[in-house]
């Protein structure tokens, strides 16, 4: 099996097919245009610069384009980059498909769907359950295909659903520890909090922000969707407002993009488990790229910190002296 792009080290030569995840135009200090490419395979992605680009290059090297790249890995300001020596678009004779380069959630869609439905069926409040089921059914296909973000966390196929399933497991554990939490509100909040991303983002591959995503954002989108769902189902009452509040408050603070701070206990918990799952995922993905005893590259979304991968954790545990093995 070929080595994934994130497992290459500084100085290693690269000669392989990759998928363009994003392409951003810039102007160099010499006044010439260049492209910042994010290139990916199933292991993850890496940044590369394509210098002195022509108008044809700008049209040729776009998101969802498979390219054959040769070059080497170097360290730029604490982050690995692919220095391009040659690049060309793939052609039919190369026998490569976009699906060959897409990272996917560790769980299959049907397995995740079964898990999400299990939590919906556990809800006892009929209004909360009906609104949640209605919205999930309305956006089911996209929910189980889309990433949770364009970068930073769960930015892979079915990442949104995988993020939700992980959060539901966290919510279940916390409800066991703190029985005063209302499971209906917390489970519904987990399922709905990021559902607006199926409108905010363009699709499961090379996701970008849509017009609605740029002008409204997933939080405002889902608050509106909850209101429309309640009206369609003939549901009135406090549950509707609190579900909207859970979505509005899940980023925690205004400076983190939250229109309201959490003012309901379940909203506070939702914020913490959302934050925890996202951050653990970011750290894990950074640690996957380094060997034991090394620091990761800086993680911008985590205050630009580098994380250490303890060397002792990779050492096999000594056998128990009393063991017969």
From Swiss-Prot:
GO molecular function terms attached to this record: 3'-5'-RNA exonuclease activity; DNA binding
Gene3D superfamilies in UniProt: Hypothetical protein af1432, Nucleic acid-binding proteins
GO BP annotation list: rRNA 3'-end processing
Entry EC no(s): 3.1.-.-
Domain of life: Bacteria
Record's keyword terms, sorted: DNA-binding, Exonuclease, Hydrolase, Nuclease
Similarity field: Belongs to the YhaM family.
Protein name from the UniProt record: 3'-5' exoribonuclease YhaM
UniProt organism field: Geobacillus kaustophilus (strain HTA426)
Underlying gene: yhaM
């Amino acid at each position: 099996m070929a080595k994934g792009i994130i497992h290459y080290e500084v100085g290693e030569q690269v000669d392989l097919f990759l998928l363009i995840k994003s392409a951003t135009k810039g102007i160099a200090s010499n006044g010439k245009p260049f492209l910042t490419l994010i290139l990916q395979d199933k292991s993850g992605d890496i940044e590369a610069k394509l210098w002195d680009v022509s108008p044809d290059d700008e049209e040729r090297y776009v998101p969802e384009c498979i390219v054959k790249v040769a070059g080497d890995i170097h360290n730029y300001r604490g982050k690995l980059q692919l220095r391009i020596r040659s690049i060309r678009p793939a052609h039919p004779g190369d026998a490569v498909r976009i699906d060959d380069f897409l990272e996917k959630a560790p769980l299959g869609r049907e397995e995740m769907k079964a898990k999400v439905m299990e939590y919906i069926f556990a809800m006892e409040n009929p209004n909360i359950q009906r609104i949640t089921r209605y919205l999930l059914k309305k956006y089911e296909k996209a929910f189980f295909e889309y990433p949770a973000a364009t970068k930073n966390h769960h930015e892979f196929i079915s990442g949104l659903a995988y993020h939700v399933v992980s959060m539901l497991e966290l919510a279940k554990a916390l409800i066991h520890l703190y029985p005063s939490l209302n499971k209906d509100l917390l489970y519904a909040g987990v399922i709905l909090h990021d559902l607006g991303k199926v409108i905010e983002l363009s699709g499961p591959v090379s996701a970008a922000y849509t017009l609605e995503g740029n002008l409204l954002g997933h939080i405002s989108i889902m608050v509106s969707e909850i209101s429309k769902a309640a009206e369609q189902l003939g549901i009135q009452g406090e549950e509707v407002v609190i579900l909207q509040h859970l979505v509005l408050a899940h980023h925690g603070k205004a400076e983190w993009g939250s229109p309201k701070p959490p003012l309901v206990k379940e909203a506070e918990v939702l914020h913490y488990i959302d934050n925890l799952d996202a951050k653990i995922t970011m750290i894990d993905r950074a640690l996957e790229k380094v060997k034991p005893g090394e620091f990761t590259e800086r993680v911008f979304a985590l205050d630009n910190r580098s994380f250490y991968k303890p060397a002792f954790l990779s050492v096999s545990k000594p056998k128990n002296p009393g063991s017969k093995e």
